[in-house]
Amino acid sequence: MALTLEQKQKVVAEVSEVAANAYSAVAADYHGLEVAQLTKLRNQAREKGVVLKVVKNTLAKRAFEGTSFECMSDKMVGPLLLAFSTEDLGSAARVIHEFAKEHKALEPKLVSVGGELFGPEEIERVAKLPTRDEALSILMATMKAPVTKLARTMKEVPGKFVRTVAAVKDAKEAA
């Protein structure tokens, strides 16, 4: 059953809204996945804050106009599942990459982050990007390191003085 013009406009608006608020997107060939497997993938994606959409490529191309995922439009061929990261950069890539390891029928085709298009070989690299919380903790540890080092150095001065006085005392007693 073909979609009416009104239904197509609704789909384009919906995908466009998701794309406008997403950090990254992954397009994967899902041909060969069974319904139960696709349902499992949707559940895993929902838990990780990833939005999955299966739409016609022409509608997706229209939805991507004016977004950072416009770069994907020329490379979209065949039946594709679109996964959008709404919480952090790597969540969609992580979900698709992990699921593709178990189910060979799911084949990542395109990855887009920040207006840059990457091939399927880059999905693992994007999947390994830290989550927002991990990135913040790394940043805080980096910022905290010089302060901690300074505190240790300042604490060491009196300790070194005490050890020097003790060494002089021991030397005088020995003489």
UniProtKB/Swiss-Prot annotation:
GO biological process, one term: translation
Pfam families hit by this protein: Ribosomal_L10 (PF00466)
InterPro entries in alphabetical order: Ribosomal_uL10 (IPR001790), Ribosomal_uL10-like_sf (IPR043141), Ribosomal_uL10_bac (IPR022973), Ribosomal_uL10_bac_type (IPR047865)
GO cellular component, one term: ribonucleoprotein complex
Cross-referenced CDD domains: Ribosomal_L10
Keyword match Ubl conjugation: no
Key words of the record: Ribonucleoprotein, Ribosomal protein, RNA-binding, rRNA-binding
Any one GO MF annotation of this record: large ribosomal subunit rRNA binding
Self-association and partners: Part of the ribosomal stalk of the 50S ribosomal subunit. The N-terminus interacts with L11 and the large rRNA to form the base of the stalk. The C-terminus forms an elongated spine to which L12 dimers bind in a sequential fashion forming a multimeric L10(L12)X complex.
Protein task: Forms part of the ribosomal stalk, playing a central role in the interaction of the ribosome with GTP-bound translation factors.
The family this protein is said to belong to: Belongs to the universal ribosomal protein uL10 family.
Protein's UniProt name: Large ribosomal subunit protein uL10
Species this chain originates from: Psychrobacter sp. (strain PRwf-1)
